């Protein structure tokens, strides 16, 4: 029987993209809870914003995260919000921060969350042993 030559499944490509750098997995985990601006992520991880932007762009290119967009009644006053015009209903179209795409959510649920859970369990066991000493 001839070997079937085929492409890797797309999910493996996307998982590989995330795990090329541990910070990408951390970014994905962090934004799985809520939309965040790159500066907020950089501050939380104590990493320069340009490094965070580099990883965000790679994750965007891979289709795992996207820029969060919404419509607002009033002109936004906070920093880091981009105004993209007005909708037909007269609301401001704004974009800010990043959020997971459907594929990104799948990656977090299938691969990243279980890894963090195992890591947290190991940490709890370690702490418990220290307390018993």
Language-model segment annotations:
Residues 2-11, 29, 84-133:
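Amphipathic alpha-helical dimerization/coiled-coil segments
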Residues 25-31:
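Hydrophobic residues on short alpha-helical segments
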Residues 60-73:
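A short, conserved structural fragment
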Residues 40-44:
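A short acidic, leucine-rich amphipathic alpha-helix
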Residues 50:
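Key DNA-contact positions within bacterial/archaeal DNA-binding proteins
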Residues 17-24:
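Short helix-coil-helix linker/hinge
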Residues 22, 33-39:
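Short capping segments at the starts of secondary-structure elements
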Residues 56-57:
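Short, hydrophobic-biased segments on the C-terminal half of alpha helices
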